[in-house]
Amino acid sequence: MISLVSFLIVISICVISHEGGHYLSARWRNVLIHEFSFGMGPSLWSRQKGETLWSLRAFPIGGVVKLEGEDSSEEDPKPEGYDPARSLSSKKPWERLLVLASGATVNLILAWLLTAALLAGHGIMDLDRPLVGKVMEGTPAFSAGIQPGDVIKSINGKELNKWSDIRETIQDKDVTDDIFQITLQRGGRMIGVDVDIPADPAHGGRLLGVQPGRITYPIHTALRKSLGYSWDMGVEILKGLWMVLTRKVQSDVVGPVGIAVMAGDALKQGIWSFIAFLGVINLHLGLLNLLPFPALDGGRIIFILAEMATGKKVPEKWEALIHYGGVMILISLIILVTGKDIIRLFFR
């Protein structure tokens, strides 16, 4: 149940943000909006408000803002006094580009803001210093009296500068003695402790039993740092996608069922974990929608860029046919990955 609720929260925020971006930019450029729908499939509820039909559909796996002139294969009723200049296809290339890119842009902005909120409200592990944030009970560190807030200055005389130095030092294969001489900075004084850290092959070697501290940032700093984190994560997402497409790594793509399970797991771990997950999903959604694939926003943008470069517009019927093919492929992929999710969850 928690997975279903979590999934509905995640997909609602992502889809409404994405389609809201299209809607607002279309309104700004005076494009006729026939429908704003959340979900796919048969309509469960709808209400006409002005020129736009607002609807809720059966399957919460997406949404649509239906614009006049976006797909020439469909004929929608026009309001009384309709002006053909309100068709998306009649707008200038930069206006069409703006409307198409605005959905993914809103997802990327939301990912940036959610990451900034995480950095400001919860913080991230401080890996730049050997500062102890938590000591696990029943571990060598706990038995030796190491406390949260201690800074591990050295181990066996080796000075430590960052968190990873702790693991590297105690995992040194050249060290055979289980007794480690650790120097701590506690407040304004230095403390020396001898810690018995026996080898533990089950956990990959010696385990001290400490976790790093967390560092939070003022909101202005969090907003700036979030840009860097989001950029780095986006690059890794695109690298991973490229490696999957070139078969350098095995595909581990998940569909709606897999996302629901992951959303539920994130919420069980706490609100900050859920916010982090929501940010990552928005980043994925924004980037994937900008890929130059037919039917995706990025695929439609490619046609506009080609028009801007050549001065010639691709015939609408041909563009519509290409996007229709893209839709069929995407639907097939959704069915495929959903089937894989179900097999992975219930039959393995």
Model-predicted regions and their roles:
Residues 3-7, 91-100, 273-277:
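Residue-level signature of transmembrane alpha-helical entry/exit and packing/kink sites
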Residues 177, 312-333:
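Multi-pass membrane catalytic core of lipid/isoprenoid biosynthesis enzymes
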Residues 45-48, 131-134, 219, 305-321:
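Membrane interface segments of multi-pass transport proteins and intramembrane proteases
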Residues 336-348:
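Juxtamembrane boundary at the C-terminal end of a transmembrane helix
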Residues 243-247, 281-296:
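Transmembrane alpha-helix interface/packing and boundary motifs in multi-pass membrane proteins
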Residues 71-94, 102, 106-257, 261:
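PDZ peptide-recognition modules
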Residues 11-15, 66, 107, 111, ...:
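Alpha-helical transmembrane segments of multi-pass membrane proteins
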Residues 2-80, 291-310:
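Small-residue-rich helix-interface/hinge motifs
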